[in-house]
Regions:
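Short, Lys/Arg-enriched charge-dense amphipathic segments
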Residues: 11-23, 90-97, 134-144, 187-192
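Protease-associated
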Residues: 74-109
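Conserved active-site and cofactor/substrate-binding residues in soluble primary-metabolism enzymes
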Residues: 22, 31, 50-53, 57, ...
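Phosphate/diphosphate-binding loops
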Residues: 164-165, 189-193, 197-201
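Generic structural motif recognizing short loop/turn segments at the entrances and edges of beta-strands
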Residues: 1-4, 85, 116, 167-169
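Feature captures the catalytic cores and cofactor-binding loops of soluble hydro-lyases/lyases
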Residues: 95-173, 178-185
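Intrinsically disordered, low-complexity regions enriched in acidic/Ser/Thr/Pro/Gln residues
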Residues: 1-82, 88-89, 201
């Protein structure tokens, strides 16, 4: 059994943190410890808008990006975007790990979050929403669906939450007033089948 001891300059009451347990809505009903929800209460993300043309463009660009998913499947991806431009693409077997890699990328390069979009392949659960809010990113997009608590927390934090993005379709359940319908979806070409993995997505 390996043991790692970490000492910090700041004192922390671990017993108090462990007593504050929050059941999450993700895989196997996880548990978050500490004052994460207390810190969440005062968060209000900026009123950053997103254009529907960006959604369509990002979907096409991300789907065409060479990746482990296209090669083998069974991989989650997270993409940091600005407007309709993907800035960083991270993959991992775990959807949370892929998001954490984006967080680390932003921290190391001191990237400001206010005008960014986080695009993920994972479900929009409470944990995904909490992580995105902690990162300060005002827009979270996924090709997957939602959980009820994830939507509730997104609305509380002023996070724009968009799921079920595929081709010309998407569903916005939080921050709908910040979605700018700037393009007719009928003018968007369909997804190219030659970039799909085994003819399916």
């Amino acid at each position: 059994l390996g043991v790692i001891v970490v000492r910090t300059k700041r004192e922390t009451n671990y017993e108090e943190k462990l007593s504050k347990r929050v059941k999450t809505s993700g895989c196997a009903q996880g548990t978050s410890f500490g004052d994460i929800m207390e810190n969440f209460e005062g968060v209000k993300l900026p009123e950053t808008k997103i254009k529907t043309s960006w959604l369509y463009s990002l979907g096409q660009k991300i789907n065409a990006t060479p990746s482990l998913y296209l090669a083998a499947g069974a991989i989650h991806g997270s993409v940091l975007c600005k407007g309709n431009h993907p800035l960083a693409y991270m993959e991992d077997v775990g959807r949370h790990n892929a998001v954490d890699k984006i967080a680390g990328h932003m921290f190391k390069r001191q990237i400001l979050p206010d005008d960014k979009i986080l695009y993920t392949t994972g479900r929009l659960t409470s944990e995904m929403v909490l992580k995105t809010v902690q990162m300060g990113i005002p827009i979270l997009v996924s090709r997957s669906g939602f959980t009820a608590w994830g939507v509730q927390l997104a609305r509380q934090a002023n996070l724009t939450l968009i799921g079920r993005t595929k081709g010309k379709r998407f569903l916005a359940l939080s921050g709908t007033q910040r979605v700018d319908y700037d393009i007719d979806p009928q003018t968007i070409p369909g997804e190219r089948t030659e970039i799909q993995r085994k003819a399916s997505r």
